[in-house]
Amino acid sequence: MSYPSLFAPLDLGFTTLKNRVLMGSMHTGLEEYPDGAERLAAFYAERARHGVALIVSGGIAPDLTGVGMEGGAMLNDASQIPHHRTITEAVHQEGGKIALQILHTGRYSYQPHLVAPSALQAPINRFVPHELSHEEILQLIDNFARCAQLAREAGYDGVEVMGSEGYLINEFLTLRTNQRSDQWGGDYRNRMRFAVEVVRAVRERVGNDFIIIYRLSMLDLVEDGGTFAETVELAQAIEAAGATIINTGIGWHEARIPTIATPVPRGAFSWVTRKLKGHVSLPLVTTNRINDPQVADDILSRGDADMVSMARPFLADAELLSKAQSGRADEINTCIGCNQACLDQIFVGKVTSCLVNPRACHETKMPILPAVQKKNLAVVGAGPAGLAFAINAAARGHQVTLFDAHSEIGGQFNIAKQIPGKEEFYETLRYYRRMIEVTGVTLKLNHTVTADQLQAFDETILASGIVPRTPPIDGIDHPKVLSYLDVLRDKAPVGNKVAIIGCGGIGFDTAMYLSQPGESTSQNIAGFCNEWGIDSSLQQAGGLSPQGMQIPRSPRQIVMLQRKASKPGQGLGKTTGWIHRTTLLSRGVKMIPGVSYQKIDDDGLHVVINGETQVLAVDNVVICAGQEPNRALAQPLIDSGKTVHLIGGCDVAMELDARRAIAQGTRLALEI
């Protein structure tokens, strides 16, 4: 069998899991929607149908103080059971199991009635928590147990008690957030009392034939965080209190070390889980950046853990496990760890989806149905939008011919994949290459198509992308001026002193590329831990190395410039932008806003900064100043009476946006 460790059953005593895969908890935003139960039922059922052994729901609060935001989802009353039963019945009909995550967000709750062990404000929240009294703590423990009881009545197979990531239970555990002097604070035995009593109360309420997962923070990655000795002590106490499984938690939300984004190596933290092996007899789950069945199987086969948690990979591909088990791993749409359509959406109050799979969490809104009228369609441009349209339209029965002027598919993805930390884009291109074969798309590369050649098609989809915008600066045609395509696509030589005009996504990518000192650590776990100051020995509190970050300096002197007076990189993703800024600043890259450009000549780039004229004596000026749509074919086709659709950068080119491009291409393909 392929991946024998991954597909081995796991005996929990009172029940058996059919494989070693936990679909980790993700808040989708549907938990608060009026029709959320039906949409979540479809979302989870599709994953259960394709083999997930145990699904964990998005976080549900046990009471009003624990919600993530005002109006957040709770399970604290029997009247809410029918809503949840819709979900559990759908999962069970597909042969899966599902656990409800009980999440009290503590001082991370973004509403004015938040509570915590101590009245200490989180650095990522404007609200200050109320310090819980002894009586309130006892009531909270009962609220957790009540929530678990209601979950059982609603048909859930278990619960996950969320004890990591800096949420309430985690806040009781560390001196960073617990400054109490009563029985709930002080020494570690007191600080862990709340976590243990919650698990004990839940077990007493639900009986012995019900799964209790405890999500244990094994690596806090914050100052004054927990130690490994404390982790062992807590794990043993949690086992004694009645837990069934221990899941790994990595990093608090306020930590300034990346834990799930693309620059994090695959399986980067399974070594943390392995250190707990032998200290408890419960099955251990490891997590974070496990996006590939081979990586998962390797982790299990070498004994790092008993199960793997994969969350975002099931946004990217609901069929991940069934494809792996049936020998079709090359058809898996791999999670690239970008966060652009999942976490970044949740943090602005939108529904989760996935950059590489826009149907995720929208299954009921985007059904895949056979085409009513099969058409002969031309797609011009094999970038993200064109690829997404082509394979989805062909899967519905349309005859699709995909043209591209270049020698390989991918468009801007071929730029992105070269950026250190974005190597996962190779997987996306592998997926599209394979699906072109599977769906029967006719691919014509090295083919600059004309309007006349498109006359025979029923409709044309223009996904012809963008052309870089050339800003009106005197001397813009000077030999030292390069576009980002010259650098990233054509590999033009670049000197040691560089000015980058533009601080959007492309500007940051170009800076990451030009400032990279040697091999990227996104493929090297030890190197990654060293660069970001993670103590691999786990001897230091919080898992932080005494030496701190060791990000090496750039081999080039680079300055990034933008006209806007706002913070450079302000438009980058909420959950990943800080990683790029931190990395570049640590490498010595300068970022200057509010710049006026005067001219470019042999002396360099002439600018005005804070009212002062300066000459930046650089070897090269790299232009990353936006894009214009490439619509050359649109008007001739329209003039000839043909139906034309514009998608991707060809439609809107303000910023290169793969999330929008793939979603637009997919939606059109499902409608045409």
From Swiss-Prot:
Positions contributing to NADP(+) binding: Q340, R563, K564, M654, E655, L656
Binding annotation for FAD: Q340, A385, D404, Q412, K422, V449, G649, L656, D657, A658
Gene3D superfamilies: Aldolase class I, FAD/NAD(P)-binding domain, NAD(P)-binding Rossmann-like Domain
Keyword annotations: 4Fe-4S, FAD, Flavoprotein, FMN, Iron, Iron-sulfur, Metal-binding, NADP, Oxidoreductase
Known outcome of mutating E165Q: Loss of enzyme activity
Positions bound to [4Fe-4S] cluster: C335, C338, C342, C354
Record's catalysed reaction(s): a 4,5-saturated-(2E)-enoyl-CoA + NADP(+) = a (2E,4E)-dienoyl-CoA + NADPH + H(+); a (2E,4Z)-dienoyl-CoA + NADPH + H(+) = a 4,5-saturated-(2E)-enoyl-CoA + NADP(+); (2E)-decenoyl-CoA + NADP(+) = (2E,4E)-decadienoyl-CoA + NADPH + H(+); (2E)-decenoyl-CoA + NADP(+) = (2E,4Z)-decadienoyl-CoA + NADPH + H(+)
Enzyme Commission identifier(s): 1.3.1.34
Pfam families: Oxidored_FMN, Pyr_redox_2
TM annotation in the entry: none
GO molecular function, one term: FMN binding
Residues the record lists as binding FMN: S25, M26, H27, G59, Q101, R215, R289, A311, R312
Active site: Y167 (proton donor)
Induction, as annotated: Induced when cells are grown on oleate as sole carbon source. Repressed by glucose.
Pathway membership: Lipid metabolism; fatty acid beta-oxidation
Database matches in CDD domains: DCR_FMN (cd02930)
Reported cofactor(s): FMN; FAD; [4Fe-4S] cluster
Residues that hold substrate according to the record: R176, H253, E254, A255, R256, K567, W578
Role this protein plays: Functions as an auxiliary enzyme in the beta-oxidation of unsaturated fatty acids with double bonds at even carbon positions. Catalyzes the NADPH-dependent reduction of the C4-C5 double bond of the acyl chain of 2,4-dienoyl-CoA to yield 2-trans-enoyl-CoA. Acts on both isomers, 2-trans,4-cis- and 2-trans,4-trans-decadienoyl-CoA, with almost equal efficiency. Is not active with NADH instead of NADPH. Does not show cis->trans isomerase activity.
Record text on subunit structure and interactions: Monomer.
Domain note: Is composed of three domains: an N-terminal TIM barrel (residues 1-368) which binds FMN, the 4Fe-4S cluster, and the substrate; a flavodoxin-like fold (residues 369-467 and 626-671) which binds FAD; and an NADP(H)-binding domain (residues 468-625).
Family designation: In the N-terminal section; belongs to the NADH:flavin oxidoreductase/NADH oxidase family.
Additional information: The overall reaction mechanism can be divided into three stages: initially, reduction of FAD by NADPH, then electron transfer from FAD to FMN via the 4Fe-4S cluster, and finally reduction of substrate.
Protein name: 2,4-dienoyl-CoA reductase [(2E)-enoyl-CoA-producing]
Record organism: Escherichia coli (strain K12)
